[in-house]
C-alpha cells in the first residue's frame, strides 16, 4: 500500500492527527522500499523511529495498532514505566523484544493453521472414527476388509455431519507443554525447558472419556502439532519479528527526568533509558526461539509529556527517535466526528449490543452533538482524557436502557439531546462529582 492508501485506511478509524498518520505511513512504506534493494544495501538502511507527543486518548496507540493489524505485522505495546534497570527487581527492557518474537510466532502459527485447517480437521475426524470403529485384526479376510472400509467411510461421514456427537468415547490426549516464563534470562529458559522435558517423559498422553463433540476440541492441539511444521514456524516468526516487527513504547515520558524535580525522581529511570539505548539502536537479544537482531525493528515511543519534556530524555535516546510528531487535543467537532464517521463507532457498538435484546436504538444528530459538547466540557474542566471520555458519557446516558432491558424489549428508542442533558446534568454541573465519575 502507498502512504496515501495507508492514511486513507487510518482515516476510517482515527479522526485527524494527519502528521502522525503520515509519519507512520512513510515509515511503513520505507520498509517495503528497503526490501526491494540488494542485500548489501538493505543492511545499511534502518528504520527511522518515531516519537509521538500527545495527551491520552488522542489516537497514539490506535494509529500504530491499526497499521500493524492492517499489514499483518508483529506488534506489541508496552509501557516504559513497567520496566526497571538491570539489577532492580522487575522486568528488564529486553523482555519487550521477547514479547515481540512470541507475538510474531503466534501470528505465523495462526496463518499456518488457517491454511492447514482442512488437514487438521481430517486428522481429528480420522482419529475419532478409529475409536468408534476399531481396526480389524491382522488376519482378516479380503471380504471383511472391504466391508470394514465401507463401514469406516460411512462412520466418517456421520462424524463429519455431527450425527454421533453425543456418543461417549475414550481417547488418548497429548498433554500440552507447561507454560513457562519467557522473561527469564536465556540460560534459565534452557533449564526450565529441560525440567519440563523430564516431567513429560513419564506420561506423554492421558486417557480420558468424553463425547465425540468434546473430542473434536480436545484433539485440536495434537492435530495442530502433528500437521504443522514447528521449526519452519519458529524460523519465519523470528524473521518477521526481526524485519517487520513494531514495538510501541507508551508512557516514555514517565522515565524522563524533569530538571525541575530531579531530586525526587526514581534513580532507576535513567537506567531504564540507558538499557533502552542498545535495544533501539540495534543489538542481539536471546529468546527461547533463537537470537534476534533489533536493528530493523520499528520503535514508536509515545508520551503525554505533561510534567517532563522530550528534551528531558537523555540525549542519546533522543537521537534514536529522529522523527517527532505532535498530536493535537480533540475539540468538540473531532469528538462529534469520532461518533459519526469512524468504522465501528461507539454508537454503532451500543446499537448492535442492544439489538441482541430486541431493542432498536437510534441517536438524533442533536443528541450526538450534545454528547460531543458535554464530553469536551468534561475534558476541559477535569483531566483531558480525549476520546475515552465518550465511553463514560455514553454509558451514563444508556445506563437505564441497558439495565431495564425487559421494559424496552421490542421497542424503538430514539435518544435525543434532552435525554443526554438529563442523564449528565448533575455530573456536568458538579465539577467535583465529574472528576470522579466522568
Residue positions per predicted region:
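Non-catalytic accessory segments flanking P-loop/AAA+ NTPase cores
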Residues: 1-438
